Amino acid sequence: MKYLKGLLLPALLALAPSATAAKDAPSIETTTFSNELVNLQYFDDSTVALVQELGSGKIYRSPDAGKAWKELKDLKKGLGIIKNPYDNKVALVLGEEQHWITYDQGETWQDFKTEYSPSPNGPVSWHSQDNKKILIHEIEDCLFTPCLGLTYYTTDGFKTKPKTLVEGRRMCQWAKGSERFLEGQEKHDDRILCILRGKYSDRSKDFRLMISDDYFKTAEEPVMSSGRTVQGMANMAAVKGYLVAAVKADHSSELSLYVTQDTENWHHAQFGNGKIEEDAYTILESTNYSIQVDVMSSKYVSIGSLYTSNSDGLYFTKNVDNTNRNPDGFVDFEKIANIQGVVLVNIVDNAKAVQERGAHKKLKSRISFDDGRTFEELKVKGSDKELHLHSSPGIVMGVGNTGDELGKYTDGDLYVSDDAGLTWELALDEAHKYEFGDQGSVLVAVFDEGDTDKVMYSLKHGRKDTWKSIDLGYKIRARELTTLSDSTSLRFLLYGSKKKDGGGREHVLIQLDFNDLHERKCEDKDFDPKWSDPTPTFESCECDEFRDFECDFGFKPEGEGKDKKCVPEKLTLPKDACKNGDSTYMGSSGWRKISGNQCKGGSKKDEKTERKCDEADLPPPKSDKITSEITRFKGSNFLEQYYLERSTQNDDDETDHDETVVMLTDERTAWITHDHGKQWKKAVDDEVVRIYPHQYDNNYVYFLTASKKVHYSEDRGLRNSIHSFEAPVMPNQEMLQILQFHPKQKGWLIWMGGKNCEKVNSKECHTAAYVSQKNGKDESWEPLVSYVKKCAFVWREAGRDVKEERVFCEQHANEETGAPLQLISSDDWFKKQDVKFKSVVEIALMSEFIIVATKEKDDTLRLDASLDANTFAEARFPPKFFDIHQTAYTVLDSSTHAIFLHVTVNPRVDQEYGSIIKSNSNGTSYVLSLNAVNRNTEGYVDFEKMQGLEGVAIANVVVNVNEVNDGAKKKKQTRITHNDGADWREKDAEGKAYECAGKGEEKCALHVHGYTERADPREMYSSPTAVGLMLAVGNVGEELGTFGEADTYMTTDAGLTWKEIKKGSYAWEFGDQGSVIVIVRRGEDTDHVYYTLDSGEKWNLYQFSERKIRVDAITTVPSDTSLNFLLWGKDGKELVAVNLDFSGLPQFQRKCDLDEKDPEKGDFDLWIPQHPLQPDDKQCLFGHVAEYHRKKRDAECRNGQRIDHMHNIQRNCTCTRRDYECAYNYERQPGGECKLIEGLDLEDPTAVCSKGAKEFWDVSPYRKIPLSTCEGGNEFDHMGDVHPCPGFEEEFEKKHGISGFGLFMAIVLPFAAAGGIGYYVWRNWDGKFGRIRLGENGGAFDSDSRWVQWPIAAISGLVAVVAAIPMLVGSLYRMVTGRMGGGYGGRTYTSRSSFARGRGDYAVVDPDEGELLGDDSDEEV
């Protein structure tokens, strides 16, 4: 449609001729209430209104537009009133568990109940075409998981009890939940869309969108992108005729928007160079033909850019920059009611000064008559002054001021427009609330800057000389002025408060009735034909070249008016264009008709035009072969390398990819590449001493210099976006971590610096912590506390009901260096603080646990643990726990609701070993998992969990501990666990029998080198995306040999069977989720690599250089999804980085076909991992049969974006001995049975009764493995009988009857857990490690060894300082200094795979796990 300004119909001012007044003033009726009022609402097109008292919860109803009010006494303790927006007779009143619904505008109500309270975040979802179909959402559980709740549904308006729709939902809504979405279509009447928890995960990165047509008896996950489903769903909303779903990438705040018009076909919305981020976009009140989105263009000031989509919601173009927003995401954007295309916005005129210097915003108002494509100034009639208005709905009246910018609200006056915003005039001095009635023939306003006793009204369109006043007889502070939503009534309601006699204030509702002012009702003849009806009529005009077209996607406007051009910015080729040698293609002219525009004929500006192929943003040409690029650098060592992996790659757009790596050499030069090492450039000109990638967001990276200057980027260094800020003080000199990051607020930083440290050995020098909420910019640093060892943000995505501002610090008491540490906490940047613990040894903050170790008066250590950061519980250990002194620890893993620690038993150099212990689910009880596990001097432990598959782990043990204690060299063997060992083949890769074959597993097993002996400690056996695949370097025999004797082995079945793939020691990496595996000789000069495309069946050679170079490492992106790799090494005196690109191979030109409905139809098989010691049902692993997607070996295609490899839990298995482990205080015997540790007494089984249990079981030596989901069968944890707790005998008898079968009650551990720390009994893996063997089964270790007599103690993440000469050892996240030439300790979140950002080490570990450190692994500059 083409809008002609002078002929626009006004939204509300129908401009009917004023009727002759029969009375001098409207009638007034006042009703007084004791409490403040909320939820004042009219039923549409009626005179019935509802209102609620805030204090009492009472609901009142008025049938006569507010003249008289009556309490609805049956509606008790209502929490809120929610009207059905699609039916003016229906409303809900929600209570705690009892609720009420009306279908006759509140005259009668029917009650119903739900189990829990309604959600505070949109508790009701209405069906737009059936008023009986309603969804009720219960309050979400946000403590231990991201906020997930339960939803009920009704199809009969709650005549019957509501039924459970789905549990574990983020949100749900009807497909027909918007008036225009699926309008007029008969299908999908019962369709519901829900964002649910992941298949087998509660993490927000795994949230899925599910669609059901039968109330979730069955459900499907829609295909969103490139024929694949998409995880990480964050939100969805209906916008006119569109449904928009937002997807959040892991380790990033970046979002992708997917749009559909039918719930069946989804498209990835494209914003050109724009980027959508979490909490940084607002979907605005859009038109019928397009979606309008305001996107924050600055992270730390509320300024945005307005984008408008094309008609299918796919392509968005920027219309205006510097729109004004507030911190809550509300945008100064208003549409003139009932008229498509007229938009008013406020822009920030001095945006650059606001962003750079924090200047005060200068706001200006602009209006558009073409749906936001072009904007112009607001003009006052008879004046050349600009008008600026405060944002307000309806906007044919507004409070504002003339001049250069928008002033304060209280300095504004009331203006009115009678031509839909084209021109404006002053109505009343001072700011007023206002409302329209009788289609605009009556305008009412009330003073809004304080108390007033007058109400103003105009019957002549609000012109300044037409206003009259109504004397109320008392002063009122106006809160709200309203009428019917369509402004057709002559009755208004004014709500406010007035002073009471005797003090205080009372609340009043005043009805203003203008009906008696008219002698007669206006008839048709009284209306000017031009303004006869507020219903718009349309007349198509001839298309105008300048007014009816806008720039198409990929083009940006240049010039204005007739000189306006649309210049190519990013041209995307149409499908199949520019192939087969074509030099041109038919593409966009650069123009498109404005969405919804109904012009005809005239200009044909949007017709396709011929364009040259080389104008398009083409992906690099495919070479049909592997390519390599060698880059040389000055220096002797690479100090640091980090991948900044983008998690929102769009597989549909081959140009929308970057693989960014940052690297630091020992020349103190930082380099950056965006194409995985094909082209490098200097990141910054200054010398850099450390690189800090953001712990939680891969888009952020920081380059620290030797001064206070810090360079940083918020988008992976793209588009020359590296800026700088000044830190408050120099970095600390105490080897402490310098930067700490917030998991949610990406711009919140804690800087650990050194104060008064300019002079060497200054006595005044001490550490000081500072915080910035603006990423260090704009002099935003505020001091926290001084004399601190560590400060960290406490908030996490789930499990901690704390403020985002909460910070824990370890501070020296009385601010004295060397004084004992105390743990202090604050929610307001330490304006107030709380001392949590004194005499602190160490604190560890992880994703799930917070562990604090303190020293007692007798020099023993006490351990306290918390899940919620509020309540701590003490951990108790068996008798004689501290008899064996601990000297060091290494944190191995805490990714499965328990902490794995290695406790050093022998700390002597080159003779280190210790025990692995495992905590229960709340971190308060530790039990033995494996003895005599090997460790090296740097603190690394030979222990690694397999990635992508739970429960499989490999460790190396020292088998001659007695000799080692006497000074002998360590002899090591490898153990693997799938729960209780694994089977091995007896043939080598060449088909020959091993020399040791037939000698039994003691003499003939496979042993592999772990962390402690790897040349590059950043390598891993497995990949998070190549399920079931592992590579290792080792040998077959009686014990682990040297690296020089080692060969390279591979397994494709999670360690059940292994085969030798190459003689000698190789480094490896996985690409495209296992589609390609590349290996290279480690630490030797070489000119080639080997690669396999069929999971190791065939190995091919690729020569990447004409001369040999020494390769020290091979890397790829942390997710192992790329087809690019980097080799790192040296060529003579130069450093070299070699890019290997496999994407050109013909085998990867097609994207793999994955259909979840028929998973084996396309390019994938379903793989089921097996248990090596389950003769009856080998497919049962942890009590269930799990199915995983694995690409077929002969499939010639690429996986692309990360796949959710877990397809399904096919079934649960019956319980067997393999589903149980030894209970607390029990140890495994050589025959496999569990026996009470000598000297300990049985626990009192009745102890659970004092904690609220109604029954208890006899003590069992066994407990179920936490990962097991087995059902029935041999339940070893219920070997005894169940008994009633005192006082529950009768209930027990009724429940159990003759069957004697009862609810399982876990035997809790012998310590008192405080509130908030539940009894999730997570179990010990004692004795579950079996040799990687070729022969028969045997005991895993000697239980008579003195190292098994008592579970060895360790403090999670804490240094056990009880030895005479304590040895401080960092956790796994410490990078081995010197291995890669570094001169600095490791970062708290950096692993041996530190430059592979986000990658796990000993297991798939949350970034938080890096918090667990000893003193010597901290930072130094």
UniProtKB/Swiss-Prot annotation:
Q: Where is this region: Disordered?
A: 596-625
Which regions of this chain are Lumenal-facing, per the record's topological domains? 22-1296, 1371-1421
Say which species the protein is native to. Phaeosphaeria nodorum (strain SN15 / ATCC MYA-4574 / FGSC 10173) (Glume blotch fungus)
Name of the protein this chain belongs to = Vacuolar protein sorting/targeting protein 10
Record family assignment: Belongs to the VPS10-related sortilin family.
Q: Which residues cross the membrane?
A: 1297-1317, 1350-1370
Q: Where in the cell is it found?
A: Golgi apparatus, trans-Golgi network membrane; Prevacuolar compartment membrane
- Segments on the Cytoplasmic face: 1318-1349
Q: Which GO terms describe its biological process?
A: Golgi to endosome transport; Golgi to vacuole transport; protein targeting to vacuole
Print the organism lineage. Eukaryota, Fungi, Dikarya, Ascomycota, Pezizomycotina
An example GO CC term for this entry is: cytosol
Q: Which UniProt keywords apply?
A: Glycoprotein, Golgi apparatus, Membrane, Protein transport, Receptor, Repeat, Signal, Transmembrane, Transmembrane helix, Transport
Check the record and name the SMART domains matching this protein: VPS10
**Does the UniProt entry include the keyword Lipid biosynthesis?**
no
Give start-end of the signal peptide.
1-21
The reply to whether rRNA-binding figures as a keyword in the UniProt entry is no
Q: Where are the BNR repeats?
A: 100-110, 367-376, 415-425, 671-682, 1049-1059
Q: Which residues does the annotation flag as glycosylated?
A: 288, 922, 1212
* Alphabetical list of PANTHER family matching this protein: SORTILIN RELATED, SORTILIN-RELATED RECEPTOR
Composition bias of kind Basic and acidic residues appears in 603-615
